[in-house]
A protein has these predicted regions:
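Membrane-embedded alpha-helical segments in integral membrane proteins
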Residues: 19-33, 55, 75-85, 235-239, ...
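Non-cytoplasmic
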Residues: 56-65, 235-252, 263-266, 566-581
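Hydrophobic core segments of alpha-helical transmembrane domains in multi-pass membrane transport
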Residues: 16-27, 80-81, 99-105, 132-141, ...
Length: 682
């Protein structure tokens, strides 16, 4: 009971403010900076805050975490920088042209893509932003090539010659413009949401879009406005950042900025704008302090990931309507349907199944004896990535959760397994199992803080894990517990007797491992564990009413996913007979996830189709930007046209063949009423 004159303190807000204070205190105590560099970090933190507030604005309007926020401003920034640096345009003219382009880009993205998913689960819209991210990254890389130049790390000169020397640090007009513009833009957004009638309408439509539409609020137009504002904020942050540290291009530039913005969102529980801005500025100062006090800037990534994990551990769970609304899962309508019992018992259908299985086995087993060596190796890689795809089917297709750092778990499993077999001479099969266990342990450690809360926290934390693993944990600059990229190791014989040192033998071994992983995953799906995971995905509250622990079910799915990912990574590392961290980057996690969506997350066979798509694109399209275009466009087309992925095409073909075999007419559309027979008049 509240005492008179005493206000209740929101524990969530108190935790967020304490986290911001702890970040600032950590920077001041352990990562001290000269005052000039502290001002430099404050300016960069302000620009990161603009990016984070733009993400929070979209989240407040759509309840969607926009992973394309950093890339919305990439293409306009590239154009503006090219206009100024290559064509000699004045600073203000180039900035204005880029600003107009960013607004147009935000409108086009919302109107042409996001609006098409307005009736889809929010998780599906979040996946769509991943496809948009890949498209925009590719466009940002291609733009400078139209001029035949390279924009990487080019700095835009300030429009005036103002300078301020603080110690040994020189701050120019770019710093002053960036600081003033970032503060004004965040203040403008706060005023817009609190005082402007459109801002109030945006807040109302975010809470209950259907009710807002019934009251005459133009929800679609407001969403377009929000995306245009967010794109403009992204552009302003990246353009002003270009004058300080260089033009950002590609994943390497956009992902660290996105990590800071996401960390700020996690601290603020995704929507408190003042806390988002304060956390982003504090993280910018912390990053500057880490960069100054360490030999490499990569040390900042594990620290930011640790901050996110600690904040998630101390945050309280909530069952309020707002937090319940943020919970969303992958669509379950496109799961593979088993054949009807009468069809399975039909002799001709059973003969057809036996024929298809026999022909498939003959082709797969006989392929290495007729293919060239390079094709045998490439097909073995497909088998390894198919196991990784199975891990995403379990996590996203069954549990309805997203992992954007799956390749980090794959890499850890690969590193542990390669270390066991190359240094400790462990049996290859045992090494694969150890790699799988390592992946499961990592998944458990990450899932405990992330899966306690409803929403997309697992996607955010695994994204942080991916960057921290790529830049720090699996970097030979910091650790040497795993084989370095230059070290080639031999595959040990199976059980000390059966050699798998040739491409054909390793192909057959990889095929066997894939078959066992497929059988194990299928068995889990048919068990009570699989049914519980599906039940929690479909209706978490209803499952909890039957005494099903929802968090434990989701954590189980993530651990199973981690084990499969670790086994796939171990298999891939021994295929290459070397370990290179570049094969397990965060960009690779994006590609693997989108390929799994293209293959189909509703079926185990979709994992194989997604792996074939991913590796096939890289065989025929060696250029990275065109690979990103094909992957981004592919996932958007699948979400729009074929929600079940390529795997659903096989199910359609299966149903047609079965119908022809049993000589049954097509099933009528249940939405179309059947004609009522009318008796002729006497």
């Amino acid at each position: 009971m509240r005492r008179p004159g005493v206000q209740n303190v929101d524990p969530t807000r108190a935790i967020a403010l304490a986290a911001v204070a702890a970040i600032v205190g950590t920077q001041l105590i352990y990562f001290g900076l000269p005052f000039g560099l502290w001002l430099h970090g404050l300016v960069l933190g302000g620009l990161n805050a603009v990016m984070a507030v733009g993400m929070a604005l979209i989240y407040r309007a759509n309840r969607v975490v926009n992973f394309a926020q950093a890339e919305l401003g990439t293409a306009p920034t590239a154009f503006a920088a090219a206009f100024i640096l290559f064509w000699g345009w004045p600073y203000l003219l180039g900035f204005g042209a880029g600003l107009i382009m960013s607004v147009v880009a935000g409108v086009v993205v919302e109107f042409a893509l996001i609006r098409r998913f307005r009736h889809s689960p929010r998780l599906v819209v979040t996946v769509a932003t991943l496809g948009i991210t890949q498209l925009l990254v590719a466009v940002g890389i291609l733009i400078p090539r139209w001029w035949g130049r390279n924009l990487a790390s080019e700095r835009i000169a300030p429009p005036v010659g103002w300078k301020l020397t603080v110690g040994q640090v020189i701050l120019n007009a770019n710093h002053l413009i960036a600081f003033v513009a970032s503060m004004m833009m965040m203040a403008g957004v706060a005023w817009f949401l609190a005082r402007n009638r459109y801002g109030v309408a945006i807040r109302a439509s975010a809470e209950r879009g259907d009710r807002a539409a019934m009251l005459g609020i133009p929800v679609g137009r407001l969403n377009t406005m929000v995306w245009a504002i967010a794109a403009a904020m992204s552009y302003v942050a990246l353009f002003l950042r270009s004058g300080i540290i260089g033009v950002p291009l590609g994943y390497a530039a956009g992902l660290p900025t996105l990590l800071q913005a996401l960390a700020a969102l996690v601290i603020a529980r995704l929507e408190r704008l003042p806390t988002v801005a304060a956390a982003a500025i504090a993280l910018g100062l912390l990053e500057s302090g880490v960069r100054f006090n360490s030999d490499t800037p990569a040390a900042a990534y594990p620290i930011m990931a640790l901050v996110m994990f600690v904040v998630l551990l101390v945050q309280r769970t909530s069952s309020s309507r707002r937090d319940t609304d943020t919970a969303s899962t992958w669509r379950g309508a496109d799961e593979v349907r088993p054949l009807a019992l009468s069809d399975r018992r039909n002799a001709r259908v059973r003969l057809l199944q036996l024929t298809v299985i026999t022909v498939g086995m003959v082709i797969v087993i006989g392929a290495p004896f007729v293919l060239r060596v390079d094709y045998i190796i490439k097909t073995s890689a497909i088998f390894a990535f198919a196991i990784i795809g199975l891990s995403l089917v379990v996590l996203t297709g069954w549990a309805g959760q997203i992992s954007l750092g799956q390749m980090a778990i794959v890499g850890i499993g690969a590193a542990v397994s390669a270390t066991c077999t190359s240094r400790w001479h462990v049996d290859l099969t045992l090494g694969l199992l150890i790699g799988g266990c390592a992946g499961g342990v990592v998944a458990f450690a990450v899932g405990v803080p992330a899966l306690r809360l409803r929403g997309l926290y697992l996607a955010v934390t695994t994204f942080a894990l991916g960057l921290a693993t790529e830049q720090w944990l699996l970097s030979d600059r910091f650790f040497g517990w795993f084989p370095s990229g230059e070290t080639r190791f031999e595959r040990p014989p199976l059980f000390g007797r059966i050699r798998v040192d040739t491409p054909v033998r390793y192909y057959l071994y990889s095929l066997t491992v894939l078959a066992l992983a497929f059988a194990a995953t299928r068995g889990i799906r048919r068990s009570r564990t699989g049914r519980v995971i599906i039940a929690v995905r479909e209706n978490e509250r209803a499952a909890q009413s039957y005494s099903i622990p929802a968090v434990r079910a989701k954590l189980t799915a993530f651990v199973v996913s981690g084990v499969l990912a670790g086994v796939g990574g171990a298999l891939y590392a021994h295929l290459n007979q070397s370990f290179s961290v570049t094969s397990y980057s965060t960009g690779e996690s994006f590609s693997v996830f989108t390929s799994a969506v293209i293959g189909g997350l509703g079926s185990l066979g979709g994992a194989l189709l997604g792996a074939a798509y991913l590796r096939g694109v890289r065989w025929f399209i060696p250029s990275q930007e065109w690979q990103l275009l094909s992957s981004g466009a592919g996932v958007l087309l699948v979400l729009l046209i074929l929600p079940g992925g390529l795997g659903s095409l096989w199910i359609t073909v299966r149903d047609v063949l079965v119908r022809l075999v049993v000589n049954r007419p097509p099933v009528a559309d249940p939405d179309v009423p059947s004609p009522v027979p009318v008796e002729p008049a006497a």
